[in-house]
UniProtKB/Swiss-Prot annotation:
UniProt protein name: Serine hydroxymethyltransferase
This protein's pathway: One-carbon metabolism; tetrahydrofolate interconversion; Amino-acid biosynthesis; glycine biosynthesis; glycine from L-serine: step 1/1
UniProt superkingdom: Bacteria
Name of the gene this protein is made from: glyA
Self-association and partners: Homodimer.
Taxonomic lineage from the root: Bacteria, Pseudomonadati, Pseudomonadota, Gammaproteobacteria, Enterobacterales
Cofactor (UniProt): pyridoxal 5'-phosphate
């Protein structure tokens, strides 16, 4: 018999110590990785529930196992909330991750060797949009598009590449682009050659849910997202569509299960359901507006301090610092800021002279600091501290001084009060 008082702390102290140290790290470090966020205790309650015990291959009302009457309710809640939140008429909440959601879309609609047009990883795209080191770049013939001299997506280039190469699918979405994407323009280009428009909105899903960023669902044939990042839910994936194409929906469902996955993670789907409900609250809209405002505030400080921001602005939750002119590598910037308890990630910039393991840039995002309660004043102060570190990247006295300021503001704005 299992007893509810069983715990990790007494049974596996080695593991528990690492878990507790991670709690301390999150509380005492400022998190600026654009893809990271803090999920609510309600989501964690769902993920730690007995739903983890239940196998439920299939879909609500059409399972291959018995005993699914209650997990059917859980999954249907998640489906209905996803559709309502994003204005879709189809939702699949089973993908274990954004990458698996993308894989399911490709497998549903493409054959190996088909041509796809996706954003160049070096210009802000994502691994699953055709990077040669990813399955998407190995299975399909990839034609990349990128940004122009101003740092904005070059739609004329997309149109020209589409006309020349006749891809079966055009992919919209990004992992490091700070502008607004014209989804209607991308659909127009896709329609001009009879291609699917597939949008991966993983990074901006929370902003879209709150009306802060344009919604691709009315324009794209298929949309995927993660459920974490700006959406602030559990780690997982989601597929959406609109337009009433039941054959497309059947293909997508079959591609997820049994095509790419077996049993769904019902405890995670419960977490998704909770997060989707939270995303419908007025407080969530206010949070997303603050995320965007904080990013703009940080950009203003970096520009005023003489740092180059790719495209010179941000229209979402993230931006890229280009450190080429400062003769600082992304790797060194990442490490120095880390010593000050400020967590970022090194990131390639357009036409980067350094390798992806070194890079010449840093990606910065504001979802996590905003979740702590930071507003523009704190965001500006933080950006100033980061400039102080980067201006004195080999001065450990300065870095330690900034670290103490970081510890103080983290204590003032705890992640979990």
């Amino acid at each position: 018999m299992l007893k509810r008082e069983m715990n990790i702390a007494s049974y596996d102290p080695e593991l528990w110590q690492a878990m507790e140290q991670e709690v301390v790290r999150q509380e005492e470090h400022i998190e600026l990785i654009a893809s990271e966020n803090y999920t609510s205790p309600r989501v964690m309650q769902a993920q730690g529930s007995q739903l983890t015990n239940k196998y439920a291959e299939g879909y609500p009302g059409k399972r291959y196992y018995g005993g699914c009457e209650y997990v059917d309710v859980v999954e249907q809640l998640a489906i209905d909330r996803a559709k309502a939140l994003f204005g879709a008429d189809y939702a699949n909440v089973q993908p274990h991750s954004g990458s698996q959601a993308n894989a399911a879309v490709y497998m549903a609609l493409l054959q190996p060797g088909d041509t796809i047009l996706g954003m160049n990883l070096a210009h802000g795209g994502h691994l699953t949009h055709g990077s040669p080191v990813n399955f998407s770049g190995k299975l399909y013939n990839v034609v990349p598009y990128g940004i122009d001299e101003s740092g904005k997506i070059d739609y004329d280039d997309i149109a020209a590449q589409a006309e020349k190469h006749q891809p079966k699918m055009i992919i919209g979405g990004f992992s490091a682009y700070s502008g607004v994407v014209d989804w209607a323009k991308m659909r127009e280009i896709a329609d001009s050659i009879g291609a699917y428009l597939f949008v991966d909105m993983a990074h901006v899903a929370g902003l879209i849910a709150a009306g802060v960023y344009p919604n691709p669902v009315p324009h794209a044939h298929i949309v995927t997202t993660t459920t974490h990042k700006t959406l602030a839910g559990p780690r997982g994936g989601l597929i959406l569509a609109k337009g009433g194409d039941e054959e497309l929906y059947k293909k997508l469902n079959s591609s997820v299960f049994p095509g790419c996955q077996g049993g769904p993670l019902m405890h995670v789907i419960a977490g998704k359901a909770v997060a989707l409900k939270e995303a419908m609250e007025p407080e969530f809209k206010a949070y997303q507006h603050q995320v965007a405002d904080n990013a703009k505030a940080m950009v203003e400080v970096f520009l005023a301090r003489g740092y180059k921001v790719v495209s010179g602005s941000t229209e979402n939750h993230l931006f890229l610092l280009d450190l080429v002119d400062k003769n600082i590598t992304g790797k060194d910037a990442d490490a120095a800021l880390g010593r000050a308890n400020i967590t970022v990630n090194k990131n390639s910039v357009p036409n980067d002279p350094k390798s992806p393991f070194v890079t010449s840039g840093v990606r910065i995002g504001t979802p996590a600091i905003t979740r702590r309660g930071f507003k523009q004043a704190e965001a500006r102060e933080l950006a100033g501290w980061m400039c102080d570190v980067l201006d004195n990247i080999n001065d450990e006295v300065t870095i330690e001084m900034i670290k103490q300021k970081v510890l103080a503001i983290c204590a003032k704005y705890p992640v979990y009060a």
